[in-house]
Amino acid sequence: MASPFPPSSAVRPRDAASLLIYRHAGARVQVLMGKRRPGARFLPDVYVFPGGALDAADARFAADALARRAAAGRAHMVLEPQWLQALAARHGLHAAALLRAALREAHEESGWRWPKADLPGLDSSGVRYIGRAITPAQSPRRFHARFFAVPDERMQQDPHADGELLDLRWVDVHNPERLPIIDVTEFMLTELQRELGGQRKAWPLLSYVNDAVRVRRLPISP
């Protein structure tokens, strides 16, 4: 797979996060995706998962979540699942901030939101960590994106939301080829299948070297 981005001077990648909202349709697995607007600066007219850059509010929210857990005598656990505990042990609040960014962006872009009752302590039961990817050095807009996944029944639809993504649809993870997607998206769809099938023992980092994709499988790290 070659890089889909045009040559440009290297810029530092921004921390970002995406959320794969998935559902089971019989024996098949489907993921919610939408098309970026034609005038978007990054990947216009391409189908993506809801997601975006980490912002200062995400870090503040994560700090508040940790404070609530400290008050409850659980300061050592930023988040519940074992893999998120590992992220938190290595990077502290950064792990919680990334998950919060994924949840926030999902609401803003698709209208699907995390239950309000679960937000104060950032109860993340049911969430899976899929992997991460770093945009090629030649891209004019670069991201160090982490990908999380959650079943649709764990989310709520906001009837008043006007999502930023167009043409929201459920896409079969086994057959996304008819839509314009980039290699990172295709890769994460495959990783979701492997995760749900219990076939993974490590978490991937996808990056680009000399315009070619490189995948390393590493211990959990955000």
What are these regions (language model features)?
Residues 1-222:
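N-terminal leader/linker segments that precede catalytic domains of diphosphate-processing enzymes
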